[in-house]
Design a protein with these regions (language model features):
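Pepsin/retropepsin-fold aspartyl endopeptidases
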Residues: 1-130
C-alpha cells in the first residue's frame, strides 16, 4: 500500500501533491503559493508535520486541477514538506478538509483517487427564517 501522489496544475505550473487524510489542513511550498498569486499574511501559529515544527505566517487560495478536476481551497504556506516514496519532493500536502469538501476519496490499496462523488454543483441548505 503506497501513499497517493499526483501531478497537479497550479497557475499553469506542475507540482507534486501528496494526499494525506491524517493532516487536517492543506500545506503548500512557497513556489506553489507564488503560482497562486494570492498570498496573504495570517497570525503566526505553529504546526508539527512529520515530527518537525514549523511556523505558519502566510496562506493562499489554492486553485488547482487534479486529474482533470478543478478544486479551490485555502492552504498554508510552509517551508518544507519532504519527499514521496520515490524520493521526489512534495510541493503540496492535500489535507482531509480539502478532500472532504471536494469529495475526493483516496484508495490507498490501489494508489488511486476516487472522484465518484466530485460535486458539479454545491447544494447549500439554509434554515427557514424565524
Amino acid at each position: 500500500m503506497g501513499r497517493i501522489t499526483r501531478e497537479v496544475d497550479v497557475g499553469g505550473q506542475r507540482f507534486r501533491a501528496m494526499f494525506d487524510t491524517g493532516s487536517k489542513n492543506t500545506y503548500v511550498l512557497s513556489a506553489v503559493a507564488d503560482a497562486t498569486q494570492s498570498r496573504v499574511p495570517v497570525q503566526a501559529r505553529g504546526v508539527t508535520l512529520g515530527g518537525r515544527p514549523h511556523t505558519l505566517r502566510e496562506a493562499c487560495l489554492l486553485r488547482a486541477t487534479i486529474e482533470g478536476h478543478a478544486i479551490e481551497d485555502d492552504a498554508y504556506v510552509i517551508d518544507a514538506l519532504g519527499h514521496d516514496d520515490q524520493g521526489r519532493p512534495i510541493d503540496i500536502l492535500v489535507g482531509a478538509l480539502l478532500m472532504q469538501k471536494w469529495c475526493i476519496r483516496p484508495v490507498p490499496d490501489e494508489e488511486r483517487l476516487d472522484w465518484t462523488h466530485y460535486p458539479s454543483v454545491f447544494n447549500e441548505f439554509i434554515g427557514s427564517p424565524a
